[in-house]
Amino acid sequence: MFGLGGQELILILLIILLLFGAKKLPELARGLGKGMKEFKKAQTEIEDEFNKVVDEPPRKTPENSTGSKS
């Protein structure tokens, strides 16, 4: 996970705890969770739309009837 080990993650969490305090952590985690959920939802919608476009059969273009034949 981004090249971070367990000790680094614990250190980062302790710094966050010191910066925001214990009362703000649940609110921050809730906001982060909602943000990740929205991001994944948008990502899924984009992937579905892309797959739908890719899976469509190619459209035939109308041939030009005024063109000259050699």
Curated annotation (Swiss-Prot):
Membrane topology: Single-pass membrane protein
Alphabetized GO MF terms: protein transmembrane transporter activity
GO biological processes: protein transport by the Tat complex
Compartment(s) of residence: Cell inner membrane
Disordered, as annotated region: 50-70
A single GO cellular-component term on record: TAT protein transport complex
Membrane-spanning residues: 1-21
Compositional bias per record (Basic and acidic residues), positions renumbered to this chain: 50-62
InterPro entries (UniProt xref): TatA/B/E, TatA/E
Gene3D superfamilies xrefs: 1.20.5.3310
Record keyword Kinase present: no
Keywords: Cell inner membrane, Cell membrane, Membrane, Protein transport, Translocation, Transmembrane, Transmembrane helix, Transport
Domain of life of the source: Bacteria
Summary of the function given for this chain in its UniProt record: Part of the twin-arginine translocation (Tat) system that transports large folded proteins containing a characteristic twin-arginine motif in their signal peptide across membranes. TatA could form the protein-conducting channel of the Tat system.
Family: Belongs to the TatA/E family.
HAMAP family given in the database record: TatA_E
Subunit structure: Forms a complex with TatC.
Name under which the protein is recorded: Sec-independent protein translocase protein TatA
Organism listed in the record: Chlorobium limicola (strain DSM 245 / NBRC 103803 / 6330)
